[in-house]
């Protein structure tokens, strides 16, 4: 939105002041210039599919003012990124804009406006976008980007705004836009409110939308109240008060909100992914679910069902789940058609293994153990209970073992830059597999499936012996084996001799002995930790990468090549917390927490309220610079690491463990938690300033042994006091 003073020069920078405030699902920008104060609130109304730009302008001067207000939206010429940005010989000749009443209407494939409703030509029909104005009359408009900007002009000085009037022309071919100008007359001290509405919807509906904002201020205020109430309601199910403001703001608001964004969008919509990704990544989406289970289990279970329906009947996950996913009728990576359509040529070793902790966390949070008997179709054919789906995932790993008896790395094993194939083996996946069997034994015990428990016991023991004999290397776990048997990540390798994830997952899985856990975690701290978090491995690949070590394509200290891959920070937080190392767990949190980096924003560069995919590591000259914001698995792994690890909220099928692992400097903390229809007020006291451990536990004044609270002891309003 551009504000011009009629008959005056464009904005002079040193007289202009502005602020930008971000809230849950809205952004507010404020500016002051030449006695004019403006505030614009950007948001999408609850359960709507268009955007509102709600502008209030106040004349703080002592004279009447006449202001040109221009709202501008630059439309793409096609909803597909490649068609819009690359195939210009097509996309620049299918659009036009026209003015209708109080809005600029863009039409893609406008020449198809005479075909019958419901009919398409070459799978194409007219697509409509609009920008409309409510609360004031339209003075002038423009629908052509080139004419709006003007020759030799830029977005800071578009010719239409400089001249005070747009040219009332639409575009026909080339580049569309929607620009609308209105003139506001303001007496001294007067405020006026208008709204620009932007969306992709048919013309008739667009007209009704704009008309519904006639009482602009009242409608927008009400919508924002509803939006804020919705999000605060979602976040209110788990709130904390600790001695750390950074920890509080991330867990209570911004990490939680980030988790909802990744849960909703997966990796499908951002300026980084470019809107080109044509589905949900299996591992990404299943992990994202974990971040919202403690806040919105009813939302989480719907996505769990969806992802279970994207599991192939052989137990593997579809690497990419199409937006048009049709359970029971999908092609798989075994079919050439799937590979051609999605670009994913093979299964990944880890995809289905993420189901185990995710399903377990949902059932434990809700107590809905009966969920494992729910019947859900497989992606390609047949159906089975959730329990059967999990058993098939075990079968998939069992049927894809390498020559040592560990899971094969296949096309990738979480690390997309490790191609181990059908013969190479992954320690990371082996530890995931070990953990999956531990979880499934709990479900099998509930099912009284003794025969299967015996099978899992024997299989887990066999796998454990292999990991112990082949993967422990004095003070660390190796990363795995190449297809020809070469060890990845052994102590004397010249490059990549220390890896983060096998160490954290050796602890998370419950495999590592106390001695191994302490040694491995200490090596992580000594070798991998930095002031911005732990790097993924060290030293970076450069001259000694094996054929499947694709990380070597990246510059040293970048992404998988010894960058600080932020998703892994959540796992090292959890691992340290599970071992009772509260100081270390919190240190890893604070090193990578967005809210703790405002004093070095010029280095980090990302927003101070959301996580990024990675931070450049110590081998980079830009050490500390972060990238790929919002849509990252970091949101969920850090949330789990903090809630289950540092705060110690660890439910199981029948109750709740409270086992905090906190900085010893903390005197204590409080939690407000909704849990299975009960509201828990939890007070943790730390008079002896220890990092972990439970000295006493009171539930509604009743002493309870240990740190475990059976569900039967909980009431509608439950008071819990734990002394460390």
Stretches with model-predicted labels:
Residues 29, 44-159, 163, 207-237:
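Polysaccharide-binding surfaces and accessory modules of carbohydrate-active proteins
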Residues 1-7, 12:
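Single conserved hydrophobic/aromatic residue that forms the stacking wall/gate
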Residues 225-276, 302, 306, 396, ...:
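Low-complexity, Ser/Thr/Pro/Gly-enriched N-terminal "stalk/linker" regions
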Residues 270-279, 320-347, 379-385, 404-426, ...:
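Carbohydrate-binding/catalytic loop surfaces
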Residues 72, 86-87, 318-319, 434-551, ...:
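Catalytic cores of carbohydrate-active enzymes
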């Amino acid at each position: 939105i551009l504000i011009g003073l009629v008959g005056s020069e464009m904005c002079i920078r040193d007289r202009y002041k502005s602020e930008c405030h971000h809230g849950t699902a809205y952004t507010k920008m404020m500016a002051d210039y030449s006695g004019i104060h403006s505030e614009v609130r950007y948001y999408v109304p609850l359960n709507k599919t268009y955007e509102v730009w709600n502008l209030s302008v106040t004349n703080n001067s002592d004279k009447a003012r006449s202001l040109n207000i221009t709202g501008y939206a630059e439309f793409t010429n096609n909803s597909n990124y490649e068609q819009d940005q690359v195939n210009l010989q097509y996309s620049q000749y299918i659009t036009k804009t026209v003015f209708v009443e109080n809005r600029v209407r863009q039409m893609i494939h406008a020449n198809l406006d005479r075909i019958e409703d419901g009919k398409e030509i070459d799978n194409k029909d007219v697509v409509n976008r609009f920008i409309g104005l409510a609360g004031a009359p339209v003075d002038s408009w423009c629908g052509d980007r080139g004419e709006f900007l003007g020759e030799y002009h830029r977005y800071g000085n578009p010719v239409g705004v400089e001249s005070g009037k747009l040219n009332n022309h639409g575009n026909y071919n080339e580049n569309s836009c929607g620009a609308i100008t209105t003139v506001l007359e303001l007496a001294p001290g007067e405020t006026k409110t208008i709204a620009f509405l932007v969306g992709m919807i048919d013309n008739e509906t667009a007209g009704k939308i704009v008309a519904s904002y006639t009482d602009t201020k009242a409608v927008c205020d009400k919508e924002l109240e509803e939006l804020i109430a919705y999000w605060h309601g979602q976040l209110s199910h788990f709130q904390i008060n600790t001695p750390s403001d950074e920890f509080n703001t991330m867990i209570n608001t911004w990490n939680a909100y980030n988790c909802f964004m990744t849960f909703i969008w997966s990796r499908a919509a951002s300026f980084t992914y470019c809107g080109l990704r044509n589905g949900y990544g299996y591992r990404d989406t299943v992990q994202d679910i974990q971040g919202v289970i403690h806040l919105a289990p009813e939302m989480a279970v719907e996505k769990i069902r969806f992802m279970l329906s994207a599991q192939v009947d052989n137990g593997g996950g579809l690497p990419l789940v199409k937006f048009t996913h049709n359970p029971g009728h999908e092609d798989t990576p075994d079919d050439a058609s799937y590979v051609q359509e999605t670009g994913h040529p093979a299964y990944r070793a880890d995809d289905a293994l993420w189901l185990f902790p995710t399903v377990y966390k949902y059932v434990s949070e809700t107590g809905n153990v009966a969920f494992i008997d729910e019947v859900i179709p497989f992606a390609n054919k047949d159906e089975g209970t959730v329990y059967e789906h999990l058993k098939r995932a075990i079968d998939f790993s069992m049927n894809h073992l390498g020559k040592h008896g560990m899971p094969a790395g296949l096309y990738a094993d979480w690390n997309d830059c490790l191609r181990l194939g059908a013969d190479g083996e992954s320690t990371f996946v082996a530890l995931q597999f070990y953990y999956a069997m531990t979880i499934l034994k709990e479900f099998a015990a509930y099912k009284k499936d003794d025969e299967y428990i015996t099978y899992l016991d024997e299989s887990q023991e066999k796998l454990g012996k292999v990991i112990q004999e082949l993967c422990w290397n004095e003070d660390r776990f190796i990363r795995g084996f190449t297809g020809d048997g070469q060890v990845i990540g052994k102590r004397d390798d010249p490059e990549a001799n220390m890896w983060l994830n096998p160490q954290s997952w050796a602890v998370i899985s419950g495999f590592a002995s106390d001695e191994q856990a302490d040694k491995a975690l200490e090596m992580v701290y000594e070798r991998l930790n930095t002031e911005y978090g732990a790097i993924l491995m060290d030293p970076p690949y450069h001259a000694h990468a094996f054929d499947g070590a694709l990380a070597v394509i990246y510059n040293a200290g970048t992404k998988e090549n010894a960058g600080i891959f932020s998703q892994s920070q959540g796992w090292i937080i959890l691992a340290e917390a599970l071992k009772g190392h509260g100081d270390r767990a919190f240190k890893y949190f604070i090193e990578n927490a967005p809210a703790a980096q405002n004093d070095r924003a010029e280095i980090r560069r990302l927003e101070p309220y959301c996580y990024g995919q990675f931070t450049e590591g110590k081998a980079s000259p830009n050490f500390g610079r972060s990238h790929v914001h919002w849509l990252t698995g970091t949101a969920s792994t850090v949330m789990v690491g903090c809630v289950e690890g540092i705060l110690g909220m660890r439910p199981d099928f029948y109750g709740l463990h409270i086992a905090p692992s906190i900085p010893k400097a903390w005197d204590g903390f409080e939690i407000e938690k909704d849990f299975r229809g009960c509201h828990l007020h939890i007070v943790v006291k730390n008079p002896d300033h220890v990092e972990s451990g439970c000295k006493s536990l009171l539930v509604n004044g009743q002493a309870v042994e240990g740190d475990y609270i059976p569900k039967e002891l909980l009431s509608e309003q439950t008071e819990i006091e734990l002394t460390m």
